[in-house]
Each structure stands twice: as structure tokens, then as C-alpha cells.
Amino acid sequence: MSIRNYIWTCAVAMALIGPVMKAQEQITIGVIQYDVCDIDKSFKDLHEQGFGSCELNYSEKRFTKELAEQVKAASKKHRIRVTTLVGVPGSKSTWNFRQGPATIGLVPTDERSEKLDVYRKMIDFCVQAGIPAMHSHFGFIPEDPSSVQYKDFIEVMRGLATYAKERNVMIYFETGQETPITLIRAIRDIGTGNLFINCDLANLLMYGKSNSLDAVKLFGNLIKEFHAKDGKYPDPGNPYELGREVPIPTGDVDFPAVIAELKKQGFKGAITIECELNGTRHDYVIQT
């Protein structure tokens, strides 16, 4: 059994019982590709393991025009669709509730210009490599749409989204740091038409923002990419730290219900297996 079929069976088997829908045939299973030292070999390995897509993790020093050409060639040769370029720029990003709101993404003003420069370089690489989208954690979007901080963020994101739209690149918001309705509101208020969602339901749980099924129902066709990752809600006894990531299916993400809802909505994107538990990501994929 290929890794692709193994993961599909283990993670979402209950949701796939019943008639096979046409939309399912267009869904690809992929991973986040971190190593780009030999992209041809990496894509060859992914294809042989049964994957059909991947996300590329951005590194400013390595992502050159030469690499972009290599990515295009390897993608065509090995039939691996690169769905997004992912990165979270900034030297101070802290993944908790104490410092996170002041350090992650474009909501805080500290390092904002430097982050915007990196985001524009990511968009440029997407153009060079033929990648349709980039995505990131853009910060803890304020819940109050009348706040100065919210309005400032909307203006900054509109500028970045316009830069991407002019180059025919989409931007996906990685979920987690705000409630689903706040993210939907922000996308509407920015209003450039090229903003969508990379839906990471484990993040929404780990940040305590939503349960998995409600989030998918709310996001609807804004979801272009889906991260297969599992997690737990934050510990009420320690409300300053995120919940824990745990192996699929030992967390609180209701994968059978979620996959069924995605199929109902006609989802045709990629399900990307993400693992931040350790460095042996392919081992995790096999063991899941």
C-alpha cells in the first residue's frame, strides 16, 4: 500500500465510506517540502511515495531564480503540483499568547517593513516558479473591526494583496490566530478578490478559536488548501500557552466529519500533511 493510500485510509477512512464523488478525484495528498537542495530528487521521491502535491517552505537565501526554474522542471517531470509557498518572516515570532500578538505577522508594526519585503520576494518567486499562491500566519487579527489596529492591518494587507494580484498570485491566510468570522470579515474588508484560506484546523483548536467542523462550514469555498494536522485545545490551567499538536487521529479534529463536509462543498484543493512534532516528517507520515 502506498503512503498516500495508507494516510488516506487511516486519517479519513470513516469519511470516505460510501459513493466516491467526482470532486474527490481532483484532491491531491501532499506534504510540506523543506529540503530544496536537490529538488529533482525530492520531487521524484514524493511521486514514488504516492504524493501528488506539496507546499514549499520559503528560505530567502535559497529561493533564487535558478531554483525557480528547477522547481518548474521537477514539477512537470515528476507530476508534483506545487500548491503554495509558505513562510512566516520576522526574527521575533513567538508562538504563545503572551508575546505572539506583538511579534507574529503584519498586525504588529515592529519589523513590518522587513516582513513586507520578504512577502513581496515570496510573491515574486511564485511568479518565477509558476506557483499559484503564497501563504502565512499574518498575525492575530483584532476582533473589533472599528479598532485602529484592525483598520491599519486591513490597509497594510490590501497593499500586499494588490501587489500579489497584479502578478496573478493568490494569498492564503493560515488559520488559527483569530476566530473564523474575524478572518472572513478581514478578507471581505481587504476586498482584492485574491485572498483565500489555508485551513489548519489543528491551529484553530490549539489557539482555542473554533472547533473543526464549525470552522469548515463557516469558511466554505474560501478554503483552497487544507492542512492535515491534529491538536488539542489549550490547557485552561495554563492559558498563556497554545494547545499541543498530537499525531493524527489522537487529537480533537473530527476528520471524518470535516472531510465529509469538504466533499459536500466540492473542495478540489490539496490536503497537505503537516508535522511540527519533530524533524522526521516522512516517518510521521508513515506512522500516522
Residues of each region from the PLM?
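N-terminal pre-domain/capping segments
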Residues: S2-I3, W8, V20-K121, V127, ...
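Charged helix-capping and loop-helix junction motifs
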Residues: L67-V71, S146-R158, K209-K217, G251-D254
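Short secondary-structure transition/capping segments
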Residues: E66-E69, W95-R98, S146-Q149, I184-A186, ...
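Histidine-acidic metal/acid-base catalytic patches
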Residues: R4, Q24-T28, I39-H47, P180-L195, ...
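Active-site beta-loop-alpha junctions enriched in small/polar residues
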Residues: I32-V36, N57-S59, G87-G90, G139-I141, ...
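Hydrophobic h-region of N-terminal signal peptides that target proteins for export
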Residues: A13-V20
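Active-site acidic/histidine proton-transfer and metal-coordination neighborhood
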Residues: D40, N96-F196
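A short acidic, helix-capping loop that chelates divalent metal ions and anchors anionic groups
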Residues: S93-W95, G105, P142-S146, M206-Y207, ...
